[in-house]
Amino acid sequence: MSAQQLILDDIMRTTVSPYEELLAYEYLYSRKGESLKKLSDATVKKGILPSYLLKERAGLFGVEGDYGKMTAYIDSKLGKCSFVVNGAYGWPEKLKDSARPAPVLYYRGDLGLVESKNVSIVGAREASDAGMSRAHAAAKKLIGADVTIVTGLAKGVDTAAAKAVAQSNGKGRIIGVIGTPIDEYYPRENRQLQDWVAERNLLLSQVPFYKYKIQPFTSKRNYFPERNELMAAVSDATVVVEASDRSGVLHQAKACLRMGRPLFIMRSCAENPAVSWPSRFIGKPGVQILDDISQVLEAISA
């Protein structure tokens, strides 16, 4: 057990209400200029909890007026989801490999699914018909091997993989990881699918309720690269079906390399002359061109 975990375990034995940690996290995150990386560095990576950091910084800003307003807003959300505090009982072991682990994780469904054998199937939102077909077929084969599918529930490849689970007659399992608060829907046309994922298996988010509410719309896009990093941490391997040179999927590919998680690039994508990004990954440790799902199954069973 790491020194960081020993510190966190000691803190958890001597304090805290998870609810107070949630409020502290939400409030700290709502401050101007705050980010997941900054909060992760100041809390999880130093072995302290959000409430301790809030006490340290209390003299830097007032915590009465807007703290109460924030608390009322958070309270209105809590009946719709559950949450777990990093370092507390129930935090998924697999997520400790993340480069910037969130202090709090929001979820709907069975959090224990994170510890199952999981594979992300990711790719373009505006996917080709062939890409959609490949995503669906890959998911179907993984379901047949008792592997949980991880998806970002975006349009295109993500949706094709999710629908393979929905059409599996109850045999498949799915984890949806979203880049909005746990009770928001993006894209809106996937609302029914997202609710189905949450009710049947597991939906995850690390996006704070209050900051999301008050921040400018244009800054909300930053949550999606962080979502992809969380997907990499949740997954034992990632399969890229197709993606452009500017795709957000590349954030997940880079995270796989950092965490030592296997990354598979479908051959149709790797040999696509219209994109150059695969050449930056192919040949690096843990990266394979995917010809058959058996390669993925071998990698995650090793």
Functional labels for PLM-detected ranges:
Residues 1-19, 86-302:
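Glycine-biased, small-residue-rich flexible motifs in mid-sequence functional cores and linkers
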Residues 1-89:
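Short, small/acidic-rich helices and loops at N termini and domain boundaries
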